[in-house]
Amino acid sequence: MSEFVTTSAGDRVAYDRRGDGPALIFVVGAGPWREVDPDTTRTAELLADRGVTAIVYDRVGRGESAVEGVITLERELAAIEALIDVVGGRAALCGHSSGCSISLRAAVDGLPVAALALWEAPLAPPNSGAREWADEVNRRIDAGENAAALDEYMKDMPPEILEIVRSIPAMIEQAPSLRPDGESLAWAESAPHAQLFGGLRIPVLAMVGEATYDIMTPAAESIAAAVPGASWKPMPGSEHGWEPEAMAAELAAFVHATHAADPVARATAR
């Protein structure tokens, strides 16, 4: 059964909590919510078996986290902050796709993020057009053109994926929740990554699937080069998704190692 937390922005966010141990919060990318994302839930279940508190939540404006008004990046960050409070005040974040740029922004903005595990961050080099693209997505959202906003957001995805996404009515209904994704990606391309992320002093692991899109490996390499001590690696996965067993094993090792080396996290857990 879902649990709920109210954020500082007044939004009621639904989440599942599993396991007992150092915490990790999954931050999904554009579109998914718990009901249609079994791989993230399965990964959380496997993490719980490995001594990790795993949080899977419905992003603001999706699933059981329904809201009114403009869904800003700030509201999404407030949701992450509230969930960090739920698990004791400090947590690792696992971003997926544009959830990576949201997670990076959370850490850069000073939320109590213990570590970042980033799966296939779709970050292009600076000034690659993300600002203009996000503005167009936002324009269509503001005009009430949800289907057009979804099409614009996913215009660079393979047509067969867009066809699947458009076949799910809730994806179109929840298109306003894409604004934080676009805004975070535009921010992540607004300057060199070393300038944006280079001040982070937390463990960062960027991952890509062994079969992935052309943009993903250079992005992972760039993140690893930008953040002191960060690393990247290929993992079992394809078509932008991971394999739950392998991902859970990797995340559990990462979270436990991070926790063991982080005196703030250990103090928070007591």
Question: Model-predicted segments: where are they?
Answer:
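Conserved alpha/beta-hydrolase "nucleophile elbow" surrounding the catalytic nucleophile
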Residues: 95-100
